[in-house]
A protein has these predicted regions:
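C-terminal motif of bacterial Sec signal peptides marking the signal peptidase cleavage site
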Residues: 15-18
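Short, surface-exposed secondary-structure boundary micro-motifs
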Residues: 63, 69-70, 203, 209, ...
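Surface-exposed connector loops and short turns at secondary-structure junctions
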Residues: 219-248, 272-296
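Extended amphipathic alpha-helical segments
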Residues: 24-27, 74-89, 93-95, 102, ...
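Short, solvent-exposed secondary-structure boundary/capping segments
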Residues: 40, 257-268
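Bacterial signal peptide processing site
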Residues: 20-22
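Long, amphipathic coiled-coil "stalk"/hairpin helices in large membrane-associated assemblies
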Residues: 25-89, 120-127, 189-193, 220-222, ...
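Surface-exposed patches in structured soluble domains
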Residues: 31-32, 47-53, 57-63, 168-173, ...
Length: 303
């Protein structure tokens, strides 16, 4: 409650000082905020590196830390060895059935020779029937051999696919050991240090996109019709000592639900119990800070 009273008092003092210095009567007030992301560990292990400090500027995708990868790397080597073992067991179909095919070719040649001899009266029907049976037997053996080899090949293929998936999983886990900034921005807080043990989900640092700030202001239902997405407005910031500065802003979001007026916010209509939140994007010149009070004036040319 004490903090709420301080917030209300601070907002009231700022509004009174702004009015006393010729600043336009604000249509809405609020506080500045930025897009903030808490970067958490995606892998468990010893935190070998975390090269960020509060105020550090980061680019999107920039690597800033590393979780120990030794065990995962060894597991990957083991899986790769298993993959080589599986591949070495894969049969060479052509070589495996080459001998049987050669036997079939030889038997067919002998069968043809006996057919010619039988036609010349130099062989009997039983000899021809024997070679015919031999060819049929060898052909059946070839079919059975091919079927067995295909089953073995398919089984090895499935084993190989399973190992490949496990390798991909380990590679994904290895990638997650490399800590990166998801957005371009400034480090706002640091929650861990190199040498500590990281667990999945452990917060490491917070980064904020402070180059573009947002004034979260609140309007009454009567004012809502005056505000549209894309409207250009003028935003005023509070630098203390009755010093304000104007910034061009653009309305980027309007809540579709009303809420009770936050206790730290003063509205155009002091009796309004329900308000709608709006967000106004402002390019930061380096002076705007998260949590700073601000006001907004709708430009008359907005339709």
């Amino acid at each position: 409650k004490r903090m709420t009273k301080i917030g209300i008092y601070g907002m009231a003092v700022w509004l009174l000082s702004a009015c006393g210095n010729g600043t336009p009567d604000y249509d809405a007030t609020g506080t500045f905020e930025a897009t903030e992301v808490i970067v958490s560990a995606e892998a468990a292990g010893k935190l070998l590196q975390l090269e960020v400090e509060e105020g550090t500027r980061l680019k999107a995708g920039e690597e800033v830390g590393l979780v120990d990868t030794v065990q995962l790397y060894l597991k990957k080597l083991q899986l790769e060895a298993s993959m080589k073992s599986v591949e070495s067991q894969r049969p060479d179909l052509a070589k495996q059935i080459a001998a049987t095919k050669q036997q079939i070719t030889t038997a067919q040649r002998e069968k043809k020779r006996v057919e010619n001899l039988l036609a010349a009266g130099a062989a009997n029907q039983k000899q021809l029937d024997d070679w015919d049976a031999q060819v049929t037997l060898l052909q059946r053996q070839l079919i059975a051999q091919e079927s067995s080899l295909m089953k073995s090949t398919n089984s090895l293929t499935e084993q190989g696919n399973s190992v490949s998936i496990q390798v991909a999983q380990v590679e994904d886990q290895l990638n997650k050991c490399h800590i990166q900034s998801p957005i371009e921005g400034t480090v706002l807080a640091k929650y861990a240090e190199a040498g500590e043990l990281a667990s999945v989900g452990k917060p490491l640092f917070k980064v904020g996109e402070v180059d573009r700030m947002y004034l979260r202001a609140y309007v009454t239902s009567e004012q809502l019709s005056q505000v549209k997405l894309g409207d250009k407005v003028t935003v005023y910031s509070d630098y203390g000592n009755s010093e304000q500065k104007a910034y061009p802003g653009v309305v980027t979001w309007i809540s579709d639900r009303s809420e009770f007026t936050p206790k730290t916010i003063l509205t155009k209509n002091e009796r309004a119990n329900l308000v709608y939140a709006v967000k106004i994007a402002v390019k930061n010149d380096g002076s705007l800070k998260i949590g700073m009070y601000g006001g907004v004036v709708w430009k008359k040319e907005n339709p």
